[in-house]
Amino acid sequence: MNVLKYGMAICAMMICGAAEAQLSVGYYKFKNGAEYSGELKRRKPNGMGRTVYPNGDMYEGQYLKGKRDGQGTMMLNIGERYIGEWKEDMKQGEGTYYFTNNNMYVGAWEQDQQEGKGKMDYFNGDKYEGEWSKSKRNGQGKYVWAGGAVYEGHWKNDLKDGSGKMIWEDGSQYEGHWKNGFRHGKGTFTYTNGDKYTGEWKEDVQDGKGVYYFHNGEKYEGEYANSERTGKGVYTYPNGDIYEGEFKNGKQDGQGVFKWANGAVYEGAWRDNERNGQGKYIWANGDVYEGEWKHNMAEGTGKLFMTDGSVYEGSFERGKEHGKGVIKEKDGTVFEGEFKNGKKDGDFVEKDASGKIIRTGTFKNGRLLDDKKM
């Protein structure tokens, strides 16, 4: 600042006489110890001037009635600097602030805080442009990370909050609702492999009801918990197979019905994506098995109803009749004996419809070794 120039100008006015008591160039000391030199009016800073504060801070710019007002530059002893508009000793209007960490803000201010539209260039290469309130990202804005990720949408207290769209560096993207920086509420996430989830979220994980579209044509619609299919849902395969029932941790688990495209149906218990527990299986040809299952095969006790009218009731192992069992034919004839790997194996008794024994004998690997008619 050229104090001499100010002095000459003021002296010229003083010669004129009218402003003798109004304008001057001089020195003023504030109550906080700050020292001012520059234009004065009624013995207070007014116009252009410079103030040096006891802690080393310095302001150079315009004053009005003893307060910073108009254009000015504030340099702090910690290395931060503000260049812009002031009103009643506060940053207000448009201005640029340089932070010690090399962040730079350009935009609107109100009562010493970033308020309105502005742009922040962060030291790490990130950028934000949008609305601010109380020196935080609040309202609509766009944040671009140095790595290439982009979020455009609503903010609250520096966090993604409200409706917005995020695109990650790998190309995956989410569009929907946010809360406290998390995906929360309803939204759609598209994966890089083409998969897509549309539904409810809770603190960044799929939680609630949703639909997941797989890039291979599979589809799941139902309940989620902690990003896993958990609860009731329907899983559809591109070949026409359908499972409807309970899920746990992403797998068919609980009670459910699986319908194959070829017409076969299973209804019963599942565990870890397999038929486990009590269940009923209907083949496409009409045969029916009802009983215990283990690892997708009939295992334990059960009944096998054949389309020819015969019924087997007894033990199963690895999907075949194994152990003690009874076959009841359509005409009422009953075979009681041992089975092994789906074949008659061991001693047997055969009865007629009235329960009378009509034959006994022995089978080996499905072959009759001997018999005795009664």
What role is predicted for each listed range?
Residues R50-Y53, E60, T73-L76, I83, ...:
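Short beta-strand elements of solenoid repeat domains
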Residues E35-P45, M58-D69, R81-Q92, M104-E115, ...:
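Conserved anchor residues at repeat-unit boundaries in beta-strand-based tandem repeats, strongest
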Residues A21-M58, D371-M374:
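N-terminal segments that cap or nucleate solenoid repeat domains
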